[in-house]
UniProtKB/Swiss-Prot annotation:
Motif 'KMSKS' region: chain residues: 237-241
Organism expressing this protein natively: Salmonella paratyphi A (strain AKU_12601)
ATP-binding keyword on record: yes
Purpose: Catalyzes the attachment of glutamate to tRNA(Glu) in a two-step reaction: glutamate is first activated by ATP to form Glu-AMP and then transferred to the acceptor end of tRNA(Glu).
Cofactor note text: Binds 1 zinc ion per subunit.
Name of this protein: Glutamate--tRNA ligase
Similarity section: Belongs to the class-I aminoacyl-tRNA synthetase family. Glutamate--tRNA ligase type 1 subfamily.
GO molecular function, one term: ATP binding
Keyword field contains Protein biosynthesis: yes
Gene encoding the protein: gltX
Binding sites annotated in the UniProt record for ATP: 240
Keyword terms, alphabetized: Aminoacyl-tRNA synthetase, ATP-binding, Cytoplasm, Ligase, Metal-binding, Nucleotide-binding, Protein biosynthesis, Zinc
């Protein structure tokens, strides 16, 4: 049997982490079995679906590199197909027209709740022989079996059973002629030959209804797997304050897709004690049987740790392709300075996100207008004049500009003046970077370049002289 899965988001908002994890699990299951992965946009909610949300979903899938083999399919472009199937069901007697007014249904609901009963349609029109005009408004309901039960073997949770007496005669077409979500899903899964439906646990109650419709259509019933919820680290339902933002917000905040994928795959699935997984390892090891039935807790610190790991272990050239976007957001002109791959090597240990990296690298490429006030007050004092002058001259004398030779110049200055390296290094760091923190000084000065470093040392000396004249 050829395995075929699908990810079917509703474009009523952004692609959030819960949806991204569902997409990842569906994608991994298909790839593990050499099957196919379908992207389907369930946009039947015409009032809430937006082009912006569709674009956000596609952007998120592309950024995560969860490539699909078919689609994207749009339900709004398949209304003719859905209505044709509904008409066949009306003809076969597995569906019927319901003319009950909104007022009657509301009264029925109130009466049932007053008796402590579960609100459900009472089947009045199912058994009615009243004649109605062709243009009289009506909905179409599915004639759900009235006895027996629906049992399905959830691939994560095990067997689940629902009594048909608990299930309603579901509306499958509204009065305006539009088909409803639960029906469209069934026809889509049938037409697209989906073998495994992997989705959130909030869909468990939809599953028996959808299975009954599939059986009424004599269609094959796929396997179902319902993934548990993601909670915040406080055990409460995940919300924006926990980090439940769009996938693309994580991109904007400086995360690598590899870090987010690695984090999401472990958010409910495990393979021994392994924490770090390449994409290839995820595909090889993934199984639905290893997915937890319990809710997972979202931990931003763990995600940040993974991101820092990937910044420092992926090829710098690759990380640089993602860093480029952040550099552009900061409007940094990188034509004069180190290649971005070199920047990744320089700042990788210090920066946990690419956003942080882009916001702390400007001095490598552009001159700064002023020194950090605290750093200058502490390190650009009259006592720093001589170390800066001596190290400037030694840097000027270097013919083979390298980090090693820069280090020798700094060391030689400290030796000549008989002072510790910090007496030379800290004033030099503030002089060339404008601040009191940077990567190792030799590689920093080397990356900034000989001419620019000497110019900045002279600027710092001028700053010291000006401060002296004001005292």
């Amino acid at each position: 049997m050829k395995i075929k899965t699908r990810f079917a988001p509703s474009p009523t908002g952004y692609l959030h982490v819960g949806g991204a994890r569902t997409a990842l699990y569906s994608w991994l299951f298909a790839r593990h079995h050499g099957g196919e992965f379908v992207l389907r946009i369930e946009d039947t909610d015409l009032e809430r679906s937006t082009p912006e949300a569709i674009e956000a979903i596609m952007d998120g899938m592309n950024w995560l590199n969860l490539e699909w083999d078919e689609g994207p399919y749009f339900q709004t472009k398949r209304f003719d197909r859905y209505n044709a199937v509904i008409d066949e069901m009306l003809e076969a007697g597995t569906a019927y027209k319901c003319y009950c007014s909104k007022e009657r249904l509301e009264q029925l609901r109130e009466d049932q709740m007053a008796k402590g009963e579960k609100p459900r349609y009472d089947g009045r029109c199912r058994h009615s022989h009243e004649h109605h005009a062709d243009d009289e408004p009506c909905v179409v309901r599915f004639a759900n079996p009235q006895d027996g039960s629906v049992i399905f073997d959830d691939q994560i949770r095990g067997p689940i059973e629902f009594s048909n007496q608990e299930l309603d005669d579901l509306i499958i077409r509204r009065t305006d002629g539009s088909p409803t979500y639960n029906f469209c899903v069934v026809v889509d899964d049938w037409d697209m030959e989906i073998t495994h439906v992997i989705r959130g646990e909030d869909h468990i109650n939809n599953t028996p209804r959808q299975i009954n419709i599939l059986k009424a259509l004599n269609a094959p019933v796929p396997m179902y797997a319902h993934v548990s919820m993601i909670n915040g680290d406080d055990g409460k339902k995940l919300s924006k304050r926990h980090g439940a933002v769009s996938v693309m917000q994580y991109r904007d905040d400086g995360y690598l897709p590899e870090a987010l994928l690695n984090y999401l795959v472990r958010l409910g699935w495990s393979s021994g004690d392994q924490e770090i997984f390449t994409r290839e390892e995820m595909i090889k090891l993934f199984s639905l049987g290893a997915v937890s039935k319990s809710a997972s807790a979202f931990n931003t610190d763990k995600l940040l740790w993974l991101n820092h790991h990937y910044i420092n272990t992926l090829a710098p050239e690759y990380v640089a392709t993602h860093l480029q976007w952040h550099i552009e957001q900061e409007n940094i002109d990188t034509r004069n300075g180190p290649q971005l791959a070199e920047l990744v090597k320089l700042l990788g240990e210090r920066c946990k996100t690419l956003k942080e990296m882009s916001q702390s690298c400007r001095y490598f490429y552009e001159d700064f207008s002023e020194f950090d006030a605290d750093a200058a007050k502490k390190h650009l004092r009259p006592v720093a004049r001589q170390p800066l002058e001596v190290v400037r001259d030694k840097l000027s004398a270097i013919t083979d500009w390298s980090a090693e030779n820069v280090h020798h110049a700094i060391q030689a200055t400290a030796d000549e003046l008989e002072v510790g390296m910090g007496k030379v290094g800290m004033p030099l760091r503030v002089a060339v970077t404008g601040a009191g923190q940077s990567p190792a000084l030799d590689v920093t000065v080397h990356a900034i370049g000989k001419t620019r470093s000497i110019e900045r040392i002279n600027k710092a000396l001028g700053f010291i002289a000006e401060r002296e004249s004001q005292q």
